[in-house]
Structure formats: structure tokens, C-alpha cells
């Protein structure tokens, strides 16, 4: 008997058409591989989708692929991830469950003493007992685990599988994923397999009382940093597990995605003009046809602004050479003339406000309304305005002017200013 374990597909994350195709092709390859290998069931512990209700293009694709798996007689067991979670069951996950293409495994009951108990579902073909908890927003899943009735789950007999979505502090990883991590001890002991999601690199470890704690990693990319990892040789795919009364083997199955070209430039103690020249030289004669190109510029400029490092011409040249997409990373590029001081906060909005507060003193403007407290408030409002998502059925030629006009109105400007 065997099952497949995949996670963090993040369907709908990619905005560039070329990457959207790869995103879907990789997922399609995995499900086709599961059908070909005749797995008994599939586990997906979260972040199947990048948001709880993705655009219709993504939903149509997902429904077609899950129907094919369903028609092949392979059940799919899932929990929410932190991206596709919905507290009111208002997610495409729930639509897929409603039509019977997937099964949500979390069956939780809250008790008067504050404890939360979980029921195990039994896979009808193999007899495997499956349960788990969804990933929640803002690290609230830890509160659930602290209230979890672990003893009743540990008392269950037979081959048991626990699905979870979140970071485990005991697991050594360089995934760089943000968010709180919890100790492994919050999970029930004695399960045969712990199917993890959230961490984007493959990781398989066993501990005393916890055998086979496994993250398959993302099959392609759920963040821009994943593309860079892919380019640097990170293997992507899913996990195939053979079992009888116990787990017999855990194997990583690699699924290839695309070719990459990485261009790195060290800007430390250099002027922007020098960096621009090196970029032009490094990209002049390279073959980028049908490749994802990643340009990474890091270091501290000795003079000039980070904006003076202009990649627009280089990007155009690479696109003219038929690169699939050109992804530029300048988030580790700073300047001696202006450097951003980091700040902390209890939530996203507070962090943003604190960053503005820490850094606004470096700015010099002739307009006092752009400085001090008024400048901080304006910056926060502007960031919120620029971060608005497209409305349902809104086209780009409607979305862009709407956001532009709102931003100009905040600044007290108009199109002619």
C-alpha cells in the first residue's frame, strides 16, 4: 500500500502567464504520477491554493484535475493552510469537499473544560486512521494545539497519520519561512506519519515518540524566494510513502519544473553606474531562451540611491531574448546615503507604521506635510491604498486608473500635476 504527500502548491500565486503555466504543469504532473503509480490516497496538509477563493481560471483548472483523481478512485485528504484557511468554511477547499473530490479531515469538538478533541477518519481501502488540524492565520494554531486532547489520539490503535500546517521548532531547516514555530511536543505522540505543510523545503526527520515527521516542500513556488532556491538546485516534488502495519519507506519524488539563469552582482562600496555596467556586461551574451532569469543585486552602495541601479534596460534586453520571465531581487541592496532601519510590531499595520516612524527622519523635503507625524500617517494611508486588490471582474485598464486616482487624491494631486 502507498500514499502520496504534497503540500504548499499555492495555486494562483503566480501572476506572470509563463509562470502560471509552469505552476499548473507541475501540479498536473504530480497528480498524473499519483494516478500512474496507483497510490491508495493523497494527503495535502494546507496551502493548496494561495488564497481561499482564487480567480476562476485557477478554480476551473483545479476542479478538472481533482475530478480526474476522483474518477481514478483515489481519495484526497486535506486540511486548510494559513493561505487558504477560512474560519467560516468559505473557501474553494469547501467547494471541492462539497462535490466529493476531496475530504477535510479535521473533525474537532470543543468541550466545556476548554479541551479540543479530534476524531480519526478511517480510509476505507487501507484502514489507515487519519486526522489533523488546519493552519490558522497569525499563528493562532498554537492555541488549538495547546488545548488538544492528545491522550485520546495517542490511545488509538493501528496505523495513524496526523496532518498539520505550521513550523516545528525541533526541525532543523533553512527554509527561511516567517511565522511562529511550535514545539513538536504539542503534537500527539505515537503516530506512524506526520504529514506537514508550510515549510517550503523537503525535510524528513524522526524523533523519540515522533517517527516520520515530513515536509514535502513546495512543488514549485509559493514565494519569490522559492524561485531563487529552485535556480540554486533545490529539488521539488512530492513524497511517496509505502506502508503496511507500519511505514516501510519514505521517498522523495522529484518533479522538474523549468530552467533558470541566475545573475548576481555585489554592489558593496560601489557606485550605481558601476553596478549598471556590470549588469549590462553579464547579460550581454547569455542564453536565456525559455528560462526564468533571476537577477540578484545586494550590498551597500557607496554613493547614490538604490533606485539609481536601473534594471529596466537589462530586463527589456532579456525579454527580447525570449526569457520566460525576469525576476529582480534588490531587497538586500542598500545605500550609505539612505538605509532603512527595521522595526517590530504586534501586527502588519503596526510594523509598517513603526518602520515609517524609524526612517522618516532621514528624509529631506520642502513640504512639511510629508514629514514627521503627518508624513507617517500619509505614508501608511498611501501604502494601504496601493495595496488594494483587483475587484471581481475588474480589468487592468480599470484597476490601474482606480488605484492611481486614489493615490493622487491622497497626495492632493491630479493627473496634470
Language model: regions and residue ranges:
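Glycine-rich phosphate-binding loop signature in dinucleotide/nucleotide-binding domains
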Residues: 34-38, 154-157, 286-288
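Structural beta-sheet core signal
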Residues: 5, 44, 78, 162, ...
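His/Asp/Glu-rich metal-coordinating catalytic cores
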Residues: 41, 54-67, 72-229, 233-242
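N-terminal active-site segment of His-dependent metallophosphoesterases
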Residues: 1-65, 71, 390-397, 417
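Accessory, non-catalytic peripheral segments of nucleic-acid enzymes
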Residues: 245-417
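Acidic/glycine-enriched edge-of-secondary-structure segments
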Residues: 18-22, 50, 129-134, 257-274
Amino acid at each position: 500500500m502507498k500514499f502520496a504527500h504534497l503540500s504548499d502548491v499555492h495555486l494562483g500565486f503566480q501572476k506572470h502567464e509563463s509562470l502560471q503555466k509552469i505552476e499548473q504543469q507541475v501540479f498536473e504532473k504530480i497528480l498524473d504520477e499519483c494516478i500512474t503509480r496507483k497510490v491508495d490516497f493523497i494527503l495535502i496538509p494546507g496551502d493548496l491554493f494561495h488564497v481561499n477563493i482564487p480567480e476562476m481560471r485557477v478554480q476551473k483548472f483545479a476542479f478538472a484535475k481533482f475530478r480526474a483523481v476522483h474518477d481514478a478512485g483515489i481519495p484526497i485528504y486535506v486540511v486548510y493552510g494559513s493561505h487558504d484557511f477560512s474560519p467560516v468554511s468559505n473557501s474553494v477547499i469547501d467547494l471541492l469537499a462539497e462535490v466529493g473530490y476531496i475530504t477535510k479531515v479535521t473533525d474537532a469538538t470543543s468541550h466545556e473544560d476548554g479541551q479540543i478533541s479530534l476524531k480519526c477518519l478511517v480510509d476505507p481501502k487501507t484502514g489507515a486512521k487519519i486526522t489533523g488540524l488546519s493552519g490558522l492565520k497569525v499563528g493562532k494554531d498554537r492555541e488549538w494545539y495547546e488545548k488538544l486532547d492528545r491522550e485520546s489520539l495517542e490511545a488509538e490503535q493501528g496505523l495513524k497519520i496526523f496532518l498539520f500546517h505550521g513550523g516545528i521548532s525541533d526541525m532543523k531547516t533553512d527554509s527561511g519561512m516567517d511565522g511562529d514555530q511550535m514545539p513538536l511536543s504539542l503534537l500527539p505522540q505515537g503516530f506512524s506519519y506526520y504529514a506537514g505543510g508550510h515549510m517550503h523545503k523537503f525535510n524528513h526527520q524522526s524523533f523519540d515518540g515522533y517517527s516520520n515527521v515530513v515536509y514535502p516542500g513546495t512543488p514549485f513556488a509559493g514565494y519569490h524566494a522559492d524561485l531563487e532556491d529552485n535556480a540554486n538546485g533545490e529539488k521539488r516534488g512530492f513524497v511517496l510513502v509505502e506502508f503496511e502495519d507500519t511505514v516501510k519507506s519514505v521517498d522523495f519524488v522529484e518533479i522538474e519544473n523549468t530552467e533558470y539563469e541566475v545573475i548576481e552582482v555585489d554592489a558593496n562600496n560601489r557606485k550605481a553606474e558601476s553596478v549598471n555596467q556590470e549588469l549590462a556586461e553579464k547579460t550581454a551574451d547569455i542564453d536565456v531562451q525559455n528560462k526564468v532569469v533571476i537577477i540578484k543585486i545586494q550590498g551597500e552602495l557607496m554613493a547614490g540611491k538604490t533606485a539609481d541601479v536601473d534594471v529596466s534596460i537589462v530586463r527589456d534586453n532579456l525579454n527580447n531574448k525570449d526569457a520566460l520571465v525576469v525576476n529582480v531581487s534588490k531587497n538586500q541592496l542598500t545605500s550609505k546615503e539612505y538605509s532603512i532601519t527595521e522595526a517590530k510590531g504586534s501586527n502588519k499595520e503596526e510594523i509598517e507604521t513603526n518602520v515609517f516612524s524609524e526612517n522618516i527622519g532621514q528624509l529631506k523635503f520642502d513640504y512639511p506635510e510629508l514629514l514627521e507625524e503627518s508624513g507617517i500617517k500619509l505614508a501608511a494611508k498611501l501604502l494601504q491604498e496601493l495595496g488594494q486588490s483587483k475587484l471581481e471582474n475588474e480589468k487592468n485598464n480599470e484597476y490601474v486608473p482606480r488605484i492611481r486616482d486614489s493615490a493622487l487624491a491622497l497626495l492632493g494631486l491630479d493627473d496634470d500635476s
